[in-house]
Amino acid sequence: MKKQLDKITPRNIDFSQWYTDIVLNTKLASYGPVKGTMIFRPYGYRIWELIQKYLDEEFKKVNVDNVYFPLLIPESLFNKEKDHIEGFSPEIATVTRVGQKKLEENLFIRPTSEVVMMDYFSNEINSYRDLPLIYNQWCNVMRWEKTTRPFLRTSEFLWQEGHTIHSSYNEAENFCLKILNIYEKFAKEILLLPVICGKKTEKEKFAGAKDTYTIESLMFDGQALQCGTSHFFADNFTKVYDIKFQNKENKLEHAYSTSWGVSTRLIGALIMTHSDDNGLVLPSKISPIQIQIIQIKNTEQIDQVVENIKDKLSDYRIDVDNSDKSFGFKISEAEIKGIPIRIEIGPRDLENNQITISRRDQQENKIKIDYKDVKKVVDQMIKDYDLSLYNSALENRKNRTFKANTIEEYIEILKQNQGFVLVPFCGRVECEQDIKTKTATNSRCIPFDQKEVKAKCFNCKKDTCLQVIFARAY
């Protein structure tokens, strides 16, 4: 195990290599046979299953139905929405043959499912009584990426994509924001990511959307990561796909739609926010194993105590290591997996009716407790552990958040720091493209939580009342 730890490059020497080393050495994933693909190993997929479980429960509270739609989309169907096809065309993988036979029409491997779902909705809806339709699917999508990295940016990835149809503009927009609130709560309370909620600029919004809302997080190295988006289309898509319904006044009206999604890049966010040079550090609610019990020696008495402890801690996901591996190996294995709580028990502990317990983020602070008190101690320790992870991430964000009023100030900040930079910005697409050309950065969001200002755009000097976060991003 020490050899395994030696393979993790220190974070402060090469953050990118550290991240890759964490992914590979903690056995979350391996590289796939095709460039840009990856193999989910069991431990990594268990994290994704927990993400699915938590989100699916929240979706069902707002009447979301799970469905599954085809992977292949006819080119003619995709081409109906001009902005949409232009936004995705560089990334679309296309099937042109079956065996040696050329297909009559190209088939796109879905980069997202708006078009195929809209086509379905157009045949499904007649009256306002049929609405809303609120669908979600857990699936894979493909976007042919040039630069790839496990979890963060792969050509094929797993995600959930929700698609809804509503009878009114306000209902659709409100549902779009309701989903964003679910994402925010999930990110903060389950993943312990102190995300910022806001709206995307005109340049950064989703192709074909009226508005795109986002949750943005800052990684340990100061680069931003988009963790989830919710798109409000108004009637942009429904007009293209002629999705009409008979309203309460018996008049035909175009419906209103939304889409929203998060992906396996959330696992990348977990790694880059919480982990350290010794391996993963996982929030308790998303850790496949919440408590690791390590038996220093295997005796009948110790086995009985371990079973008793498991009964007391039955609310938690527990793994017992009673293998013949060395004690040091067992400790290192629990450490590299990021297991929140570690309990050690051996003959000497048993003599005193004690166990030794420690947290993944404070491994040197081992404490001995009466094993009869284990439930009370673990409950509090888990709360303290999660709070500590969240506060550490929040402190990193605060320390890496800056303000600039001119492009010169902004460039100077970028030379010295990585992080969020709050600037007055006009919001124009041309201006943002100019900023990207000058600095290789882009806007992350227009934060909801801001006071209206009267200022000059930090780049073009036009009047503005917006403050926008810019950053380098994954």
Swiss-Prot record:
Entry's Gene Ontology cellular component terms: aminoacyl-tRNA synthetase multienzyme complex; cytoplasm
Keywords: Aminoacyl-tRNA synthetase, ATP-binding, Cytoplasm, Ligase, Nucleotide-binding, Protein biosynthesis
GO molecular function per UniProt: ATP binding; proline-tRNA ligase activity
EC number: 6.1.1.15
Localization of this protein: Cytoplasm
Keyword Ligase appears in the UniProt entry: yes
Reactions performed catalytically: tRNA(Pro) + L-proline + ATP = L-prolyl-tRNA(Pro) + AMP + diphosphate
Highest taxon in the source lineage: Bacteria
Statement: the UniProt record of this protein carries the keyword rRNA-binding: no
A Pfam family reported for this protein in Swiss-Prot or TrEMBL: ProRS-C_1
UniProt free text on domains: Consists of three domains: the N-terminal catalytic domain, the anticodon-binding domain and the C-terminal extension.
Subunit structure comment from the entry: Homodimer.
Name the UniProt record assigns to this protein: Proline--tRNA ligase
Organism, scientific name: Mycoplasma mycoides subsp. mycoides SC (strain CCUG 32753 / NCTC 10114 / PG1)
